[in-house]
Amino acid sequence: MGSAALEILGLVLCLVGWVGLILACGLPMWQVTAFLDHNIVTAQTTWKGLWMSCVVQSTGHMQCKVYESVLALSAEVQAARALTVGAVLLALVALFVTLTGAQCTTCVAPGPVKARVALTGGALYAVCGLLALVPLCWFANIVVREFYDPTVPVSQKYELGAALYIGWAASALLMCGGGLVCCGAWVCTGRPEFSFPVKYSAPRRPTANGDYDKKNYV
């Protein structure tokens, strides 16, 4: 596969991952009510996200409420907000950088400089994926720990929501796509090729009697 095709494929994966990360950030499904034993007949389900919480009735009616106070939020929610939004914005910067250095655009003249710009964009996408993984894994760890904590009431136990799985898939796409962009750009960075020096021997000189000197023969 050519370097340009690698860059395009990587950019497509990064764009899909970016959209998935935006969905994960906005969906109020980072944790959902855990249905355990005696509360399985409950008439409502609670969803909680980074920006709002929703209550879904058994009739299908859903009511959501946006978090009004930032200071009243837990530390993990505040950190997840900051890191996820930061990853989304960094991915936007990576998009412009990658498009500037991509072989399919003419923003920069073809050459090593253009390839290094694309390489930087791919690296930024990979960093976005890693940055998004931090709040996702941190939040999931808290949900799992509280689920198995016997001191937490059953009514307050939650399970992993769909937004976490979407976020993990988006992070994987961002890192894989960033890696493909870097691979495609690395081919065009103008790095020196490995070669072996070629030695040339001087032509043999004839002697006075017209014969070649014996020392010229090996």
From Swiss-Prot:
One of its GO terms (biological process) is calcium-independent cell-cell adhesion via plasma membrane cell-adhesion molecules. One of its GO terms (molecular function) is structural molecule activity. Keywords: Cell junction, Cell membrane, Membrane, Tight junction, Transmembrane, Transmembrane helix. It is found in: Cell junction, Tight junction; Cell membrane. It holds the Pfam family PMP22_Claudin. Residues 29-81, 145-160 are extracellular. The chain crosses the membrane at residues 8-28, 82-102, 124-144, 161-181. It comes from Mus musculus. Residues 1-7, 103-123, 182-218 are cytoplasmic. Widely expressed with highest levels in the lung. It is a multi-pass membrane protein. Belongs to the claudin family. The keyword Membrane applies. Its main location: other. One of its GO terms (cellular component) is cell-cell junction. PANTHER family: CLAUDIN (PTHR12002). Plays a major role in tight junction-specific obliteration of the intercellular space, through calcium-independent cell-adhesion activity. This is Claudin-5. Residues 217-218 are annotated as: Interactions with TJP1, TJP2 and TJP3. The keyword Nucleotidyltransferase does not apply.
